[in-house]
UniProtKB/Swiss-Prot annotation:
The lineage of its organism: Bacteria, Pseudomonadati, Pseudomonadota, Gammaproteobacteria, Pasteurellales. It comes from Actinobacillus succinogenes (strain ATCC 55618 / DSM 22257 / CCUG 43843 / 130Z). One of its GO terms (molecular function) is 5'-nucleotidase activity. Transmembrane segments: none annotated. This is 5'-nucleotidase SurE. InterPro entries: SurE, SurE-like_Pase/nucleotidase, SurE-like_sf. The keyword Hydrolase applies. The keyword Cytoplasm applies. Coiled coil: none annotated. Pfam families: SurE (PF01975). Its cofactor is a divalent metal cation. Keywords: Cytoplasm, Hydrolase, Metal-binding, Nucleotide-binding. One of its GO terms (cellular component) is cytoplasm. It catalyses: a ribonucleoside 5'-phosphate + H2O = a ribonucleoside + phosphate. Its EC number is 3.1.3.5.
Length: 246
């Protein structure tokens, strides 16, 4: 199996390096990842400046672009040879509920799916037990690879920051929901000019049983199928009826 591995925390992040070590026990893995932290880059592509891949000593690559750039470049003529699966992660921090709208981790997987390949995104609820998340991915790939090939979806996997043996199991979940984000943080630079920082994410608001929030809080690995089709299908008929009214 040939796996393309990317992330949004950057090539040197512990999460992607740990995952690469585990995946290379049974697969051919090439990393194409950002050269720096590009968290919350979402699915943005770089269009106004060139992308500059830099090959590293172990034949992996880091790029001066976003996670989506990395996967797009890798699969659209940069890499030679077949790729069977795109894996993104391990992210330092969860991607639950509304986090998926901003996540570069999810975006790398979605770009792979958009370009016709099965894809998985994996995140850890912390910064300690990356090996637990890596083992979960290695457990799941043999089970799910065939099914993923038939699907237009990606899998969003979130792992509690616990030792592998303390994880309670796997749960297939829907996305939960966060409250609105906190206000931006206003400061002043050394010249007295106003600068702003994006504030913290909102707290979980819909964390009921059956959500990804609830599963991770209870010590389970959450698995949520994500589709790139953003159409609100349930609203099509009512919207058409509204437009036809005199």
């Amino acid at each position: 199996m040939n796996i393309l591995l990317s992330n949004d925390d950057g090539y040197h992040a512990e999460g992607i390096q740990t995952l690469a070590t585990y995946l290379r026990k049974f697969a051919n893995v090439v990393i194409v990842a950002p050269d720096r932290n590009r968290s919350a880059a979402s699915s943005s592509l770089t269009l106004v400046e060139p992308l500059r891949p830099r090959q590293l000593d172990n034949r992996d690559y880091c790029i001066n672009g976003t996670p989506a750039d990395c996967v797009h470049l890798a699969l659209n003529g940069f890499l030679s040879g077949r790729v069977d699966l795109v894996v993104s992660g391990i992210n330092a921090g969860v991607n639950l509920g509304d986090d998926t709208l901003y996540s570069g981790t999810l975006a790398a997987a979605l770009e792979g799916r958009h370009l016709g390949l099965p894809a998985i995104a994996v995140s850890l609820d912390g910064r300690q037990h990356y090996e637990s998340a890596a083992k979960i991915v290695c457990d799941l790939i043999p089970k799910l690879h065939g099914q993923l090939l038939k699907s237009r979806e990606i899998l969003n996997i979130n792992v509690p920051d616990l030792p592998y043996e303390n994880l309670k199991g796997l749960k297939v979940c829907r996305l939960g929901h966060r409250s609105s984000a906190a206000e931006v943080i206003k400061q002043a630079d050394p010249r007295g000019e106003a600068i702003y920082w994006i504030g913290p994410a909102g707290l979980p608001e819909d964390e009921a049983e059956g959500t990804d929030f609830h599963a991770v809080q209870q010590g389970y690995v959450s698995i949520t199928p994500i589709q790139p089709d953003l159409t609100a299908h349930h609203s099509l008929r009512s919207l058409q009826t509204w437009l036809e009214q005199e």
